[in-house]
């Protein structure tokens, strides 16, 4: 009974996000889940959980799920949204990552950079399974719709 009530509350939160982001699977916008950006190379994450979350927001992840990608890769991916994932492992790099992206002339025409659609979120927030996924969904939704 308690579990059903909690599940219902979580579903209401998901439905509220879906209502704000009506789009069909045909017109999904490009998002990139990125990590470890150092102004020359970067890594990406790609998993079914995060893809599903992005789909609820009208996006698809253009990431390849690999590392050592170049700025040219980033330009050709043309993301409209970049979700930069911070972690303890990359703490020093993460501090300046989004600033470096925004100031890099090579990236000035990347839609997410041009339109200031780069957000940061911690690895634990975005990658953990369970109810925290809905917290992440809401956080990304708030950023996308601000």
Where are these regions (language model features)?
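Basic- and aromatic-lined ligand-binding clefts that recognize polyanionic substrates
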Residues: 2-57
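Alpha-helical scaffolding within the catalytic cores
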Residues: 19, 68-73, 101-107
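Extracellular/periplasmic catalytic domains that process cell-envelope and extracellular macromolecules
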Residues: 23-27, 75-77, 111-114
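Interaction modules related to DNA damage response and DNA replication/repair
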Residues: 55-69
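Soluble non-cytosolic domains of exported or imported proteins
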Residues: 4, 8, 44-48, 68-69, ...
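Structural recognition of the beta-strand scaffold that forms the well-ordered cores
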Residues: 30-35, 62-63, 82-85, 118-121
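Structured C-terminal subdomain patch of bacterial secreted/periplasmic proteins
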Residues: 85-146
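Proline-aspartate-enriched helix->loop->beta-strand connector
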Residues: 71-84
């Amino acid at each position: 009974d308690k579990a059903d009530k909690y599940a219902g509350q979580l579903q209401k939160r998901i439905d509220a996000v879906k209502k704000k982001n009506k789009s069909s699977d045909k017109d999904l916008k490009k998002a990139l889940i990125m990590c470890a950006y150092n102004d020359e190379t970067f890594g990406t994450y790609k998993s079914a959980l995060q893809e599903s979350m992005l789909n609820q927001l009208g996006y698809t992840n253009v990431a390849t799920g690999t590392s050592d990608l170049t700025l040219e890769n980033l330009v050709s991916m043309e993301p409209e949204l970049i979700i930069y994932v911070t972690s303890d492992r990359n703490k020093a790099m993460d501090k300046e990552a989004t600033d470096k992206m925004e100031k890099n002339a090579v990236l000035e025409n990347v839609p997410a950079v041009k339109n200031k659609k780069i957000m940061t979120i911690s690895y634990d927030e975005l990658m953990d399974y369970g109810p925290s996924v809905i917290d992440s969904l809401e956080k990304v939704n708030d950023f996308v719709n601000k």
